[in-house]
């Protein structure tokens, strides 16, 4: 299962579709965002994905976590959203 990485420039609907697809296929999705703009896009995508999945009769929960990520030899703090069926 791949991590869905979100940037501030990510299309919300594309990320929402990826989340919904991962839930349907793997019953779990992990979304990672670094920075306020990226976290904003990730949360909006999560809200859209809930609607997509609800129409399929799938109810999900989202568990936010802080994670440290190494980028170009620097450690950055990211938000990871773990999405699972309820």
What is the role of each PLM region?
Residues 54-86:
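C-terminal edge-of-domain segments
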Residues 1-2, 86:
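Low-complexity, interaction-prone regions
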Residues 10, 34-37:
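Short beta->alpha linker loops
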Residues 36-62:
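Short, hydrophobic/π-rich interface segment
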Residues 2-28, 42, 46, 50, ...:
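Conserved mixed alpha/beta catalytic, RNA-binding, or beta-rich assembly cores of soluble enzyme
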